Amino acid sequence: LGTDIISPPVCGNELLEVGEECDCGTPENCQNECCDAATCKLKSGSECGHGDCCEQCKFTKSGTECRASMSECDPAEHCTGQSSECPADVGHK
């Protein structure tokens, strides 16, 4: 029997929780132009609100480098154009 406390998501607590597209804090404190702080949803026309592959509320174009190569065994990662997150870091042996 687990003792974990599960609480419903709270919009405005700056934690991205289930059902939220963004959470930038209270409407008075929100600094994210892509996020509607009152609803924790992206504003109309926004594709994203944060991430290495998100610029001005839009996904960065496909092929844009988001993580530099660290060595010949660690190629650079590039944005997909379909997500605000940089793909997982992949290394070659």
Swiss-Prot record:
Record: residues binding Ca(2+) 1: V10, N13, L15, E17, E20, D23
SUPFAM superfamilies on file: Blood coagulation inhibitor (disintegrin)
Cofactor annotation comment: Binds 1 zinc ion per subunit.
Gene Ontology biological process terms in this record: proteolysis
Motif D/ECD-tripeptide positions after renumbering to this chain: 72-74
Record-listed Ca(2+) 2 binding positions: D74, P75, E77, D89, V90
Keywords: Calcium, Disulfide bond, Glycoprotein, Hemostasis impairing toxin, Hydrolase, Metal-binding, Metalloprotease, Platelet aggregation inhibiting toxin, Protease, Secreted, Toxin, Zinc
Compartment annotation: Secreted
Any one Gene Ontology molecular-function term assigned to this protein's record: metallopeptidase activity
InterPro entries, per database record: Disintegrin_CS (IPR018358), Disintegrin_dom (IPR001762), Disintegrin_dom_sf (IPR036436)
Keyword Lipoprotein attributed: no
Listed cofactors: Zn(2+)
EC nos: 3.4.24.-
Region span, Disordered: 74-93
Self-association state and partner proteins as the record states: Monomer.
Disulphides: C11-C40, C22-C35, C24-C30, C34-C57, C48-C54, C53-C79, C66-C86
GO cellular component entries: extracellular region; plasma membrane
Native organism: Bothrops leucurus (Whitetail lancehead)
Tissue: Expressed by the venom gland.
Similarity comment: family membership: Belongs to the venom metalloproteinase (M12B) family. P-III subfamily.
UniProt-recorded name of the protein: Zinc metalloproteinase-disintegrin-like leucurogin
